[in-house]
Every structure is written in C-alpha cells, then in structure tokens.
Amino acid sequence: MALRPCTGFTISSLRNASAANNNLFSLLSFSSSSPAKRNLLLSSLQDNLRRFASSASLYRQHLRNQQQQHQQQQQSRVKEKSETLAQKIGKSIRRAGAPSKARVYADVNVVRPKDYWDYESLAVQWGVQDDYEVVRKVGRGKYSEVFEGIHATDNEKCVIKILKPVKKKKIKREIKILQNLCGGPNIVKLLDIVRDQQSKTPSLIFEHVNNKDFKVLYPTLSDYDVRYYIFELLKALDFCHSRGIMHRDVKPHNVMIDHEQRKLRLIDWGLAEFYHPGKEYNVRVASRYFKGPELLVDLQDYDYSLDLWSLGCMFAGMIFRKEPFFYGHDNYDQLVKIAKVLGTDELNAYLNKYRIELDPNLTSLVGRHSRKPWTKFINSENQHLAVPEAVDFVDKLLRYDHQERPTAKEAMAHPYFYPIRNAESSRTPRSQ
C-alpha cells in the first residue's frame, strides 16, 4: 500500500481556517467601536491569516511534490520499458546490393605502398624512458593515462601518454598513424616512443599544449572564435582524410585549444584507422554522444564522413550552448535522441537507401517523430552564436546519409567561414 507523504495539514484544516476568518470578519462588522476589542479581534484575525497562509504554502508544496513524484514515476516507467526493449535488441540486418564508398580520398591507400598502411609490420624504434620525468596527472581514458611531463635534459614540457595493456597491433596502429600524419596542420606532434624496461609498458611522448577545459572555455568564445577553431579543426580533418585516415573519435575532449596562442591540436589517435573502400569496420568506435547514425544502425562500410558527423555534434553543442547536443543514455537511446531532432521519415529513407533493417524492438523504441526545426534551439543565450550561416552549416553536417554530408574540404568552403578565409588571405603575402 502506498503511503502519502506527511505534510502536517489536511484539506479540512484549510477549510476550518477559512471558516474562522469568515467568523472574524463578521465579528468585526458588528463589534462595538471599542478600540481594545477591535485590536483584539484584529490580532486574532492576523494570527488566523498567518496560519492560513502557512497552510496554503504547505499545500502548494505538497502538490508540487506529488507532481514531481508522478513525473519521476512516468520517467522511470519509460526508462524501464526502454531498458527492457534494449535487452531484446539484436543487430541490424544489411541486405546486399547497396555498398557505400567514400566520395573523396577513397583510393589513397590503394595507390600507396603497403608499408604505408600495414601497421602490423611496423618495427617500433624505442627511445629512452629516463629522458622524461612525470610532473602531474592530467587525464585518463579507456586505454591510457595521461601526464604532464618534462624532458630531463632541456626541461621542455611534454605530454606522456602511458598505454594500458592492449593488443600490440592497436598500439602499432596508433604509432603508424601518428608517424604518417607528423607535421600535418593542427595534428598533435609525436615526439618519442618509450617503454619501461621491466614491465614493457609503452608510453607515447607528445608536444605540450596549454589547454583549457572545454567546459570552461567554450562558454567564453565569441562568434568569430567558434568559426576560427572549427576551421582549424577542419584543416586537421582534411589533412588526415587526404592521407587515407579516419580519426573516429572527434569530440571536445580530443581537441586541445591554447586560447592565448590561438593554437588547436587534434589528439588521441587511438581509435583512428586506415580507410580501405569496401572494408567493413567495427561500429564500436567514437564516444556515444558523437556517434554517427551509421554506427548506431550497424552500417560497417562507413568512411571519413563519420568524422564530419562528430564535428557536427560538437559544433551544435557550441552554437546552441547545449552540451552534449544529443544526450542518449545508451547507444539505442542515442538513435532515439537523433530521431527526435532529425525525424523518423528521414531515418527510414536512409535505412531504405542502404537496405538496412533495424531489429523490430529498436524500431519500436525509436517510435515516430517529425523533424524539429533548428530555430527551436535558438534562445537569448545563444542567438549571438546561432546565426543563420551557423545554422545552415550545422544542418549540412548533421545528415543521416553520410554521403550527403560535406567533406572536410567542402565544409571549409561554406559561407560560415568567409570571415576566416578572408582574414587568412589578407595575411598571406602575395607572390611578386
């Protein structure tokens, strides 16, 4: 049996207080003109009014509590239903006849020599671990712990990424990719590779970036700042894509920004992979809030365009001041959150194009939703960032169909970046 919360009053007590006040009003009307009696009655009336106001306030609080309890029970029932459905959800089925291939840079690794992308054959050249000293811990992830350090001989700051025990080929893949991208625009620079002599634990040594936490930095960025840093990030993405590499984990946590120096670096290449057309990749990549629909519906022959979706989620969070923009409780709920914004008609068109059949339980969980206009996310707090060109740009990035998203190079040509391109061209010295 459900117990009612103890509130210290009943509805009848409110009625009694009201009746007492009515009696006092009557007495006031017919009382003598004696000041003493009138003051006594007024004092009694004030006491009753205070009691009534207190009871009414408690009653309103009681109603609010009941309403909150009801909402929590409803949310709990919805969550339980979602969790029950989620336990029954199987993998999506992909019918033959609708292969997907990158629109650009598809054959980079086809024409490159095998030793460019064959990371399993990499012979690692180990440096000397004693050349570096750990100063303090700055972060940790699923596969590593990260420390600020210094080079023992010249006291130069660096970042030391100590890798947790994982398959050797995963470590080799990250090293090979970092070596292939070395010197690229806004790519974090790998300085050295060392390992402990006893435990054989490997560590990667990187350039140091005086980064500020994005949760602190992003709310302070101006419209121009956002344009500038997203443009800088696109430079890094176009470079790695042009070298046949997908990052597969683009998110604010992996974008280091030294705001004083206006320097950006794309870090954490642990999930990055070489793109080969037609190859089926693991969909368990990227962080949940930044996972593209292709990952959530088990489309395995994805490509570089995955990084543009993740960038779109990051960008939407910045301009709408809503971090994360798609806030799913699990991978299935992540697809639900996307569908509530982009609509289910568009999702079904995407699934039909690539001949994907969702598990019926996932279809039931997603439900039916109409497309939500981007203007619904604009308010007085973000309207200085969510300008028309920004909204148009986010609309082009956040598309179900990965082949409809712009490439990194196409994205850089969007009108949103005109002020940045204009500033860059004015700084570039003209040839004589």
Swiss-Prot record:
Which branch of life, at top level?
A: Eukaryota
Grouped into one coarse class, the protein's main location is: plastid
Q: What GO MF terms are annotated? A: ATP binding; kinase activity; protein serine kinase activity; protein serine/threonine kinase activity
Name a GO CC annotation attached to this entry. chloroplast
InterPro entries in UniProt: CK2_alpha, Kinase-like_dom_sf, Prot_kinase_dom, Protein_kinase_ATP_BS, Ser/Thr_kinase_AS
Please give the knockout or disruption phenotype noted for this protein: Defects in root, hypocotyl, cotyledon and leaf development. Delayed flowering. Reduced growth, delayed flowering and hyperaccumulation of anthocyanins.
Give every Protein kinase domain span.
Answer: 132-417
Keywords tagged on the record = ATP-binding, Chloroplast, Kinase, Nucleotide-binding, Plastid, Serine/threonine-protein kinase, Transferase, Transit peptide
Question: Which reaction equations make up its catalytic activity?
Answer: L-seryl-[protein] + ATP = O-phospho-L-seryl-[protein] + ADP + H(+); L-threonyl-[protein] + ATP = O-phospho-L-threonyl-[protein] + ADP + H(+)
* EC numbers: 2.7.11.1
GO BP, one annotated term: negative regulation of seed germination
- Where in the sequence is the active site? D249
| Places the protein is found | Plastid, Chloroplast
Which residue ranges have biased composition labelled Low complexity? 66-75
User: Which family, according to the similarity comment?
Assistant: Belongs to the protein kinase superfamily. Ser/Thr protein kinase family. CK2 subfamily.
The record's function comment reads:
Casein kinases are operationally defined by their preferential utilization of acidic proteins such as caseins as substrates. The alpha chain contains the catalytic site. Involved in the regulation of various developmental processes. Involved in the regulation of plant growth and flowering time. Involved in retrograde signaling in plant responses to abscisic acid (ABA) and heat stress. May act as an enhancing factor in abiotic stress signaling through modulation of the expression of some molecular players in retrograde signaling.
State the protein's name.
Casein kinase II subunit alpha-4, chloroplastic
The species this protein belongs to is Arabidopsis thaliana
